[in-house]
Amino acid sequence: MNSSGGVGRTTSALCLSVAFSEYGKKVLMVDCDPQGALTFTLGKENSHRNVYDIYSGRARALGMLQQTSERVDLIASSPKLYAVGGSERVKKSEILFDALNKFEYDIIVVDSASGLSELNRTVLAAADEIIIPTRLDLLSVRGALHIAKASEQYRGKVRAVLPTMVDPRSKHGNEMLAELTAKFGKILIQPGIPKSPLFLDAVVAGQSLL
């Protein structure tokens, strides 16, 4: 999660999930981004049962689970997620946690939107651990710091900060990396994920890099 956009949240979540699957873990991905980038990448855009049903209380959990070609299961996104928030805050703050807690998976990875919306706060409330991907630019690092601060209100802990699209030749990027190192220490994954056209190619192909 990162409150800034364009940091590689969906790509990181998908690659991490497939890696867990390769190690024999039973993995569920949950797309809580109303834009549905993960759902689109996995070819499940026309799903009639999706994560919004958790928030509306209209669906039994098992009816939302879908198998994918990437060896992980998925609960798809829906544009209706834009409606989650406002006066629903108190009622829905734990609803995602309550629903996911019933699933029998080794690992559940939730992909979120940017920002700190009420929807994203339900994701924070559901998380045991939080991974913060970030580009090495000022706005992305600022967004990473916002999420780290916001997570202090919830039981989940920041497990890792993951630099993405890293260009080791960038002076500004190296300065941002030094700032992240000072702030997060050992939980900062170094050297991070390098900038590469392979990531865009994978998105176009509708698959992970693994």
Kindly give the residue locations of the regions a language model identified.
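P-loop NTP-binding core
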Residues: 1-210
